[in-house]
Structures are given as structure tokens and as C-alpha cells.
A protein has these predicted regions:
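C-terminal helical subdomain
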Residues: 176, 183, 191, 203-235, ...
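Alpha-helical segment proximal to the catalytic Tyr-Lys
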Residues: 127, 172-173, 233
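Short, small/polar-rich loop/turn modules that mediate ligand/substrate recognition or access, typified
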Residues: 83, 88, 175, 180, ...
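Conserved glycine-rich cofactor-binding loop
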Residues: 14-16
Length: 266
């Protein structure tokens, strides 16, 4: 039987990558559960755009750090949608600050958001998919820092490394149930979290990236939409890097730095 996804949940879809992903999945014919943490107006705007595409949208507040509430929100959205075929774990953020300045509370705050919340969310989604007996797609939005470090972001980097490992282990265990699990690892993307709007991508020059600009949210969303589609049926446990070639510049870029400014968290 060909996988025909009709119902998706995208966490943190009030703006940026999450919003673009919700719209891309709606364009692919899916009804979408839209979630927000602090920007209800943004989530309602995303939902309205989904509806303009002729698809159903359900909006719910979602706090990935409130681990007891996470399963209930996902189950509620799935029930309202009539089931769950695609789950996109997009909620995340934070840096944690320089390593020597961190305390355990700061560490737990970032790891709790990016890894604990992701585990509970994806576990809930996978359980719903497995119990339905139907195929499913789980996609985690990670980061290029899931494989490479970043000064001033020890907790963030550790949490994203952990999330990449979780994705790969889930892929091993869930494949026989018809559930694929993949990650999409963005580089610098023109989103509000980076103090940019999508239109800033074309007007911002990044000489250290082979494609010398930030990415657009839609360029991440298009890859997520592929992984959520029937066309990705034999793809699982993979990390899809969408970074304009940033990760290819390691030694060459490092050898051309002309100051020690990179050593500061700023």
C-alpha cells in the first residue's frame, strides 16, 4: 500500500522554519496541527494560511519543556485531525552560554527543551503511529551543530548531538513498523530567531559559505516535505544537511581567520 499522508503536526509553527513547513505540508495536501509557545497570533496566521490552501488547521499551545503536558497536546491534535501520519519536531532553541559560565540550571533548561522535549514528543507521535498500524514519518529539525561545535553554545550543541543520536536509534527500531525517522540540519537560516526575515536571505552576504547567503525557511521546509512524502519511502536514519555548503568549509575557513574574535561567545 502506498503511503498517503493526510495529517501532520508541526511544533513551533508560529513563525520561521515551522511556519514554512506547515505551509509546505498543506501544499502537499495535508491537514496540519499548528503549535505555538508564546506567539499565538503567529500561530493563528499560519493556520489561516493553511486553510487558504483548502486544508484543515488545528491550533494548540505547546511547551516542550513542560514534559507532562506534551503527550496530551499531541494526542489532542491527532484526535482533532483524525489521526497522525507526519510529526515534525521543530521546537527548540537556546544556547546555554560559555561553558565556564554555565550552571546546571542553565544546562538543564537548554537540554530539556531540545532533547527531553523532543524525546517525549517523538515518543508520543511514534506510539500513535505504531498503534494505528499504518506507516508514518517523523522528522526532527536539528542543526549543523548536531555534528559540529559552536563557541558559547555547549548545552545547545550537546542537545543537538543527542537528538541526532536519538533519531538514528529510532530509525533502527521503528523501521519494521513502517515508520521512518530522519533529521534536517539547517545552517544559518533567515528567521526571527536569527533576527532576520525570510526576505533578508537574498540581501545578506556570507563570504564563508559556498552559497554566500543565509538560507530561506522554505528551503528547509521543502526538504522536510520530501521526507514526509511517499517519495522518501526508503530513507530513514539520515541527516539532511541544508546549509549552503557551510560544513564543507572547516579547515579552509579556519585557516583564513584573521583575528581571535571567534573565541568569544558573541
Amino acid at each position: 500500500m502506498t503511503f498517503s499522508p493526510r495529517r501532520a503536526i508541526v511544533t513551533a509553527s508560529d513563525s520561521g522554519i515551522g511556519r514554512a513547513t506547515a505551509l509546505a505540508l498543506a501544499d502537499a495536501g495535508m491537514d496540519v496541527g499548528v503549535t505555538w509557545h508564546s506567539d499565538e497570533e503567529g500561530a493563528n496566521g499560519t493556520a489561516e494560511e493553511v486553510r487558504r490552501r483548502g486544508r484543515k488547521a488545528i491550533v494548540a499551545q505547546f511547551d516542550a519543556t513542560d514534559l507532562e503536558s506534551v503527550p496530551g497536546v499531541i494526542r489532542h491534535l491527532a484526535e482533532e485531525l483524525g489521526g497522525l501520519d507526519v510529526f515534525v519536531n521543530n521546537a527548540g532553541g537556546g544556547t546555554g552560554g560559555p561553558f565556564l559560565d554555565m550552571d546546571i540550571d542553565g544546562w538543564r533548561s537548554v537540554v530539556g527543551l531540545n532533547l527531553d522535549g523532543a524525546f517525549v514528543g517523538m515518543h508520543t507521535a511514534a506510539t500513535l503511529m505504531a498503534d494505528s498500524g499504518e506507516e508514518g514519518r517523523i522528522i526532527a529539525v536539528t542543526s549543523v551543530h548536531g555534528s559540529q561545535p559552536r563557541v558559547g553554545s555547549a548545552a545547545y550543541v550537546a542537545s543537538k548531538h543527542g537528538l541526532e543520536g536519538l533519531v538514528k536509534t529510532m530509525a533502527q527500531e521503528l523501521g519494521a513498523k513502517g515508520i521512518t525517522v530522519n533529521s534536517v540540519a539547517p545552517g544559518e537560516i533567515a528567521t526571527p530567531i536569527n533576527d532576520m526575515d525570510a526576505e533578508d536571505a537574498e540581501n545578506t552576504h556570507r563570504p564563508g559559505i559556498p552559497i554566500p547567503r543565509p538560507g530561506k525557511p522554505e528551503e528547509i521546509a521543502d526538504v522536510v516535505a520530501f521526507l514526509a512524502s511517499p517519495a522518501s519511502s526508503y530513507v530513514t536514519g539520515a541527516t539532511w544537511v541544508v546549509d549552503g555548503g557551510m560544513l564543507q568549509m572547516g579547515p579552509q575557513a579556519g585557516s583564513h581567520l584573521e583575528s581571535d574574535a571567534w573565541r568569544s561567545a558573541g
